[in-house]
Regions:
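N-terminal amphipathic alpha-helix/helix-capping segment at the start of soluble metabolic enzymes
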Residues: 1-11, 82
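Non-globular sequence segments
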Residues: 80-83, 94-124
């Protein structure tokens, strides 16, 4: 972060939004408007939501992704929109590990981690 100066100390922290309807991990216009509006609204730094680095590592099928060129292009749109709003841009990258196939909003079931709980296809 050397050489970067934020306009203030307010940061929008990353959150798990689960908002990719197409389940392809690609940024949508909703994401661009959502994050750009936070930048315009006064945050000095905007951190984009949890973004999976592989399809197998998603926390949900509706996560943003960063494993294809199409996704990278969408993330570029986000960065440009955040910068245009006057804020610095960051990203929370992640991988769900061995529990990547269990929906996080489900009640805990002893030993559950596979597609047996009506979850999405377990890839890992």
């Amino acid at each position: 972060m050397r050489g970067l100066t934020a306009r203030n100390r307010l940061w929008l922290p990353p959150m798990c939004m689960y908002t990719v309807e197409a389940q392809d991990g690609v940024v949508t216009d909703w994401h661009v408007v959502h994050y750009a509006s936070r930048a315009v609204g006064g945050f000095g730094t905007v951190i984009v939501e949890a973004t999976a680095v592989t399809p197998e590592g998603r926390l949900s099928p509706n996560d943003l992704g960063l494993w294809s060129d199409e996704q990278v292009a969408g993330q570029r749109r986000l960065v440009e929109a955040i910068h245009a709003g006057g804020a610095l841009a960051g990203i929370q990258i992640g991988h769900g590990g061995r529990k990547s196939g269990t929906p996080p909003w489900r009640p805990k079931v002893e030993g559950a981690r596979t597609g047996t709980l009506e979850g999405w296809e377990l890839l890992a």
